Amino acid sequence: MLSTRRQCQIGVLIVSSVLLASCAAPSTPQAPASPVPAQTPATGARPVEPGQWSLAKAAEPYKGVTINCVFLDRPGYRAAIQLIPEFESITGIDVTWEIMPYENSREKQVLDFTGNTKNYDCILIDVVWIGEFAASGWVVPLRKFYEDPALADPNLNLKGFFPILLESFGTWNNEIYGLPFDNYSGVLFYNRCMLEEAGFKEPPKTWQELLEVYGPKLTKDRKYAFALQSRRGETQSADSFMRMIWPFGGSLLDENFEPNLSSEKSLAGLRFRQELMKYMPPDVVEWDHDETVQALAQGRVAMITEWSAFNAYFTDPNTSKITDCIGYAVEPAGPVGSRPALGGFSLGVSANSSPEKQAATWLFIQWITSEEKAKDYIRAGGVSGRMSAYEDPELKAQFPYFEPLVVSWSKYGNPVFRPRFPEWPPISELIAQTGTEMMLGSISVEEGAKRLDAQIREILEKAGYYSGAKPKLQ
């Protein structure tokens, strides 16, 4: 239960997508350069004599300060809420939060920034908002805090985050603005019992195998082999459209920052999606995460590709009929290999907040994302971005989905899954509209891709990317 002193606007139980990544889009994803400043040690803080720094001591000047956070109604935020009383007890800082639907969270924060209403101190930054929030000056570069020995925990260890998470979720133009907090990868969730009944000992390793071998055997009696959440909106543009072009060698933009959806490899992924629809529920174009997760949990579909954060719904007997049958694997590979979806959020500090609130907010962000609290955060239902937590044998046994998650982040993570520049929201809307029309058959894949390429180029040209007014950053 939320305390009565918390401000809450309860959203839907399972909310929309989160999404992804960085850098100008090459055909083979390349991780951005490490954002950890060279002039600081691996901790991200200046050297401090042993025993000199403590959270309680660092927080003394801010005792009694209240900070307000933007949270979603998802497992990672409920996990943080469980841990917050410990932070408050140590520091005397009062942490409040407002829970809002994902769909409203960007707009509410932008209105707070532009109106200077100062409602939020601890800012929630989706991977695709980092460019907009940073370039607009709405969030504070975190070196202000991690280079201050009074505020920086000597054990901060920025290099302890999975590099792809810190670089994609929290970094823009080589400057860190947020620390990874709610961390996702796409995972193939499957009903092991349904697969075994159909004669399969393991899930498909490739998309082609899913289509040609698994699809026909698992689609019968009003049950389906696969479901791909595709509702118009961010779910269509990211979870469905972008998820399908990358494994086939496609991309939104090419190495020259030109729209690339009409390339043969991008078209191959979109054509494959059309073909796969015969093994999906007929109304899947209307499905969001909620419908997709429930369909697997209730035994109506055999496989889905979804965010790792939804695992709790499959293991809870109150929400799932397949608790003894749930299986996990890396997302299937295409002709160029596996390119699982990458998504998540970082926590940042509002530039509009007072210096006292900024410092208090930093102390909270540093603590809740720390290596010290990572295991507690995971046990409470969160997904930490800290590498060390996933080496714990007890946690690995308790959470078997760790394996595909860590493999995806470490080996297959695609840092350019979706651009993070400020122009993504209007581009996403266009993809959502045309992508839906493609799936419904009201426009051909080829015509839809041609239309999108022209629209995307117009947006990027108007923004100044081709004139040199803006750097070609994603």
Language model features with spans:
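Short, low-complexity disordered leader/linker segments with a strong preference
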Residues: 1-66, 457-474
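Hinge/lid segment of periplasmic solute-binding proteins
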Residues: 36, 41-61, 127-185, 211, ...
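Long, aromatic- and glycine/proline-rich binding clefts that accommodate carbohydrate-like moieties
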Residues: 37, 48-55, 66, 326-331, ...
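Short, solvent-exposed loop/beta-turn-alpha elements that line the ligand-binding surface or hinge
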Residues: 58-64, 143-161, 230-233, 248-268, ...
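Short, well-ordered beta-strand elements
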Residues: 63-74, 93-98, 121-122, 226
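Periplasmic solute-binding protein
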Residues: 82, 127-147, 156, 163-203, ...
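Extracytoplasmic "Venus flytrap"/periplasmic binding protein-like
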Residues: 82-161, 196-205, 302-303, 319-320, ...
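Glycine-centered hinge/linker elements that transmit conformational signals in sensory
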Residues: 212-218, 255-286, 327, 331
